[in-house]
Design a protein with these regions (language model features):
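PRPP-associated nucleotide enzymes
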Residues: 1-123, 127-191
């Protein structure tokens, strides 16, 4: 998606060899026009979606934007922590390693919010090694839903997440796909 690639070139910051900081327009402050355009592009790539699933927190805005494109279908987000109001035994759970934080989280979704046979689209802000998406896939399989695909705003293709998901048979769409970082700039994937 040209407008996202342009924004990444203008405002994205590369840290080291594998981190792209986009907090000024995706995952701390959100550019709402960009969000709307990304959401529209995602919705155009998938059909017959009953529900959208993401993981807290940065994927939520893009999941909601995409859900609005599908006539306001529900969005469910996996939580990274427990609380007094959630009975952990009534949740589907999976362990997920955070690439940027280097920690492992047990994510969970209340069983009431995933219905067997539902067609579910996973939406997130980033795809790197694929850990978050694979954790959501695990939960959605436990719930016996049908996974329509995985859609992300930004993909760092060189980290292998897409391949893992495609090897499992899932369709993957990214609004901006990066093959590498070279001379402090992202090199965007061209089909």
């Amino acid at each position: 998606m040209q407008s996202l690639e342009k924004k990444i070139l203008e405002d994205g910051i590369i840290i080291g060899n594998d981190i792209l900081k986009v907090d000024s327009f995706i995952n701390h402050q959100i550019d709402c026009n960009l969000l709307w355009n990304i959401s529209r592009h995602i919705a155009n790539k998938f059909q017959n979606v009953d529900k959208i699933v993401t993981i807290e927190t940065s994927g939520i805005a893009f999941a909601v934007g995409t859900a609005m494109q599908f006539d306001n279908i529900p969005v469910v987000f996996a939580k990274k922590s427990t609380s007094k109001i959630v009975d952990d035994s009534s949740c589907y759970k999976a362990s997920v390693k955070s690439f940027t934080k280097g920690s492992i989280n047990e994510i969970r979704i209340d069983k009431r919010f995933l219905i067997e046979g539902e067609r579910v689209l996973i939406v997130d802000d980033f795809l790197a090694e694929g850990n978050a998406a694979l954790g959501l896939v695990d939960i959605l399989k436990q719930a016996k839903t049908e996974i329509v695909g995985v859609a992300v705003c930004v993909e760092k293709r060189f980290q292998g997440g897409r391949k893992k998901l495609e090897d499992l048979g899932y369709k993957v769409y990214s609004a901006a796909s990066i093959d590498a970082f070279k001379d402090g700039k992202p090199v965007f994937h061209r089909a």
